[in-house]
Structure formats: C-alpha cells, structure tokens
Amino acid sequence: MTLRNFFALFACLLVLGCDNEVSAPADTTESMAETATEPAAKPHYEPWGVDLGANNPDIQPGDDFWGYANGKWADENEIPPERTSHGVWLEIHERAEKRVRGIIEELGDADNETGSSEQKVGDYYASWMNVEKVDELGISPLQPDLDRIAAIENADDLAAEFGRQYFVYGSSPFSAGLGINPKNPDEYMINIGLTGLGLPDRDYYLDDTERFIEIRQEYLIHITQMLGFANYRDPVEYADSILALETAIAELQWIRADRRDRDKTYNPTTVTALKEQHSGFNWAAFLESHRLEFVENIITNHPDTIEPLIALVNEQPLDVWKAYLAYHLISGNGSILSTKIDDANFAFVGKVLRGQEEQLVRWKRGVARVGAQQGLGEALGQIYVDRYFPESSKTQMLELVENVRAAYKERIQGLSWMSEETREEALMKLAAFYPKIGYPNKWVDLSDITISEDDLFGNARRLREFFENRDVEKLKTGTDKEEWFMMPQTVNAYYLPNWNQIVFPAAILEAPFFDPNADPAVNYGAIGAVIGHEMGHGFDDQGSKYDARGVKRNWWTDADRANFSSRTDRLGEQFDTY
C-alpha cells in the first residue's frame, strides 16, 4: 500500500459514509497491567504515542493541517539518495531491515545443520555478499541460456523459448501467469496475456514529450551495453531493432485503466479454442516449456491483442527476437551477475526509470533478496515473528479490526442512496472479511531447495525453479486460503478480493502505525486508517465486483452502481484541482 492509495481510502469512506455520522469506536483495547515490580511499558513516542516534535506550530492547522502536523520534519529531512521517497514507511522499513540483517548475520556465523532453514538463510546471504566470486564469474552463469537462445532455428523453437523465460528471469511477449479463478475462489487458473516490455508502460514508447524521448534514448544505450556484455555482434543495430519491436508491442498494449478492469480482463476460454482460433503460434510448445501442457481451462486477459501479437512474432526476423531474448535475459539477471553488469543495469533501471540517485548498499539489497517472497522469506519470517511480534499484538490488532468493521457497518447501514438489496450484500461482505494478522498459520516447506554459500546464481535459479514448479502444482491441488502473499517482515498490507481477506504483516504493526502501549486514539488514527484502507478496497471500483465469498459477480443494482460512481467521480474531480 502506498501513500497515494490513502486517497482511495478517503474516497471510499466518504462515499460510503457521507449521509451519516460515525460513532466513536468502542474502546476495547486493554492497557498493559501494572505490577508492583514491573511498571507499564511506555509507548514508542512518549508520553502517549505521537511524535509531537515533527509539527510546525507556526502553521495554523486550519490553513494547512499537513504542514502543521509534519512541517518541522519535512524541513529537516531530505529524500535519501538511494531512495525515491521518504517518510514513516521508510522509518519502519529500516527498523525491520536492521532486525532481519541481525538475524541473517547471526545465522551466518552459526554452525548450522546442512539443509536446515538456518543454513540456507545464512549461506544465501553469504553467496550474495561474496562479490569477489560473483565478479570472477562475470556473465558466464548465463552462457548456457545465451547459447540456447542463439541456437533457435524456427518459430517452434521461439515459442518454446518464450515459455521457458519464466524460469530464467527473462521476458516473453506472451504471459502465462497463475491467478485465482474469479468465479471459483477454490481453484487457480492460467491467465494468458500480452507482456514483454522493458519500459514500465506503453506511454514510455508512444509519448513524444521530452521526458519520454530522453528515456528512450537512454534505453537504447542500456540495451547496447547489455548486449555488449555478451559480446553480441552489432549491439547498436540490434538495440534499435529491439526498441522498434517493443514499440510495436506497446501499440497493442491496453491502456492502464483497461488493464486493471476485472471485467474486461476476464475472458474464460480453453487451450483447445486458443489453438483453433489463433493457430499461427505454437501454443503446445509454449505451454510445454512452461510445464503447463496439462492445462485446458484458461483466461485470456487481452483477447484482441493475441492475433496481432502472433503476427508480430511471425513477421519480425528471428535474429531480432533472439537479440530481444538475450537482452532481457542479461538485464533481468543483472543483479546476480558481476558488479560491472549490475552497476550498468542500475544506471538505467535505478537512475533513469526510478530517479534513484544511488544504488542501495549491498547488505540492504541482500537482506531484501534473501527475505523476498520468492526467496527464503518465510524461513526468515518465522524467526522474525518469534523475536519481534508478541501474540498480544495480534490480539490487540484483531480488536482494532473488529471495531473498524463495526464503524464501517454503521456507515453502510446509514447510506440513504443505497438500496436494501445492495446493502444486504454489502453487509454480508463486510461481515465475511477475514483478517490475517502478523504471520501465516502454516509455513511454506523449503526443505527441497539446495542453497550453497558460493553459488549466488545457482541459488537464485533454484529458488526460481522451486516457486515456478510450486505454482504449477497449485493448478492441480487448488487454493489454500491460509497462504500469504507477503512476508511477515514486509512493511505493507493488502486486500485480496478473491478470498475477501485483509492482511497485515508483523513488520507494519510497529510504531507509529501500531503501538500496543500508546493511547487507543493513536492506533485508531494510524493503523486504523490502514485497516479502513484495506477494507475500502473491498468496496472500490474493482473490489466491489466480488461478493462475500470472493466470487466475481455483480451484486449491485444498476441505480446503486450509478450513485456510487457519481460520488467517486466528484471526488476525482476535486482531487484533480489540487
């Protein structure tokens, strides 16, 4: 969840609550008991939980409340050169980051049993920090993949390589991603769609304003550099061809608003129909190399792009596609290759695209890699919550969730513009929200993964293979609603419409967002806003398309949907004036 997304929270709360007042939430948060020998714990920010040193009393809150509350902090702090933003999120993130580093380095110094989670965590980090070994290998770990790409002889080979790219951090114009079936929350399905761009969005290719023109020029330099690391012949010429190819893909890509529309992107079909209707591409080779040869029922996300994308695949010279695959393979693996490649990759991806002045120091990047969801994040998460997340915080958070839910219920019950038919469904959905607090009830079994202290590339590749194969198995076994899609040490939260779940990892439940020893009003104003934000996603323009069970269906009357849209449109118009 980003700062920008708080506007969505305020919009949803205003629309759902503009007709009635909100009762103060019941104060059910119990303070910690005092004993004769142990005084009550104090809040992180004394005396009652808010950092009053951040405010600027020279600003009248009625004129500029943000400036009044945060003005002094804003004047005294700058965005760090290795970051693109700054604020309380970064403060909490760095607190968790230091804790995770301590855990990792402690495990690295210990005599751990081979194959244990502790050994894997310590050795994965050690392999990342062994820069001398990484530099010694240079680009050589990628050579088998580059040789395979160079050996592509025809369209069938190309289709197979497109499918294989998901296992090697490469790229493909066709995506085949795992997703929960919008009509059945108990099963997964494969989504076929358009992808394959090296720049963030179609506008980066098609917009001729000065900024985007400069980015495209820098992109050409970047592609040339990456191909040069592989001693590619004519890298400048191929860079031009790759940019032209991706521009053609960008012209087919839907605009962002359509890509996030759950109705437009839900187009169920079958592989049999896909092969019959779009026979110019070897779907069997593509799916088999992706280990999806057994799949029949699928969803196409952007159906009108499939045929023109196939035409593009077949019309472009094979050598251009091979150069495209080679470039994305090198760039996609840049962070686990030599310092020279890594730095060159950051110079474009970090500096040009993200506006990040400096690369994060290596230990921070290593902590992020080891602790990632598709790294050893759950192994780390178990230790993190044992050390830093007491069960009492989970209990207190559940009380907060229930009180925010109660306030939301009052809002919905008091809406004069909503029909009883829609209100009944809305209240059912609200009551069915399933909160997950802190950490999973069961953890991912990582015992089959081999991690070596001197093989960074191999470690990353084996982890990628493990999680891709795990996704394939999910298609056969169905969903597990106890699964988490964030790690406990992540400072964030999310709402999952398919399962109607709101999820709050342990690391976000820290002061100033959540403080078990602060005045209850502080927690309602801080983490309460995050709780309300995630609940709000269940009733926003896309989340409201799912019912209490997480099934995608329209439970709104036409009049209620029109009323909701008119109110959110007015808020959007107001926002546009700022």
Feature names for model-found ranges:
Residues 41-44, 60-64, 68-133:
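Active-site-surrounding "flap" and adjacent substrate/cofactor-binding loops of secreted or lumenal enzymes
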